[in-house]
Amino acid sequence: PDYGWGQGTQEDFYNIAGELRKNPRFDHIRISGGNTLNCDQALPWYNALKDRLDEGNTHQLAGSFDNFAQFFTTVREDGKHATADELHNVMEAMVGMEYGMQTGVWWGPAEYARGEFCKASHGERLAYAEHRPNWTAASVYRAPDGKVQAFGGTSERQAVTTSYRFLSKERDVFFDGHGPQREYVMELPGGEPGSYQDGQTNAEQVVSITWGDDVQPVVDGTYVLINKSSRKLLDNENGSLTSSTYSTGKKSLQWHVNPVDARIGGDFSYH
């Protein structure tokens, strides 16, 4: 339930949790609360219920960064399971993990940045930064397979445009093929300070960090797309997608692949 829609009071929630505890079917199922979309209200609800809870849970569609972070810290200090059951952006996952979140559930599709963060988060966090007034965060992880990636994200509804500078102290590296260089700036678009759902794009991104003799090139230009197995090329002749063999100068074999605009909406890691 959430308090904003008349779905019940704290007392109602407390009584329901008590009834669930009496039912043996729930012996091995975590009973969860606060469950508010406004993270400023999560702790008051959680604190009122916690002696009948196994899990503290919130998500972030309103409220302050301070209370979002403090919620997970408090739940862990109480010895309970910390959850965010409605992650709207990779930013919420990064912040949650930094302050104790143990379980997260994506709201909407787990696109590229989100999926890569899920894998990377089982590895080693190399760097983390946040801008609380702007509701943004960034991090660098080394995944279990050794892949190094930079992540950036924003609040779905409350972010302010923020730039993060990633610095390699040890070596020259390539950021999505750009390099060799020591620094890279990621700009995360948002709205005006103090605004709500005005100018927001729910922006998030993942950037590959590579070095050595075999690095990812910058993807931005005209390409032919080849099927590795058949050695056929993707052809768009007369508006119909077919496979073809290479022909010099045939325009229907040429594909323009360019980075999407950062304000496209959601994950802008794509082309």
Describe each model-derived feature in a short phrase.
Residues 4-221:
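Substrate-binding and catalytic surfaces of secreted/luminal carbohydrate-active proteins
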Residues 215-271:
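Lectin-like carbohydrate-binding module/patch detector with strong preference for beta-trefoil
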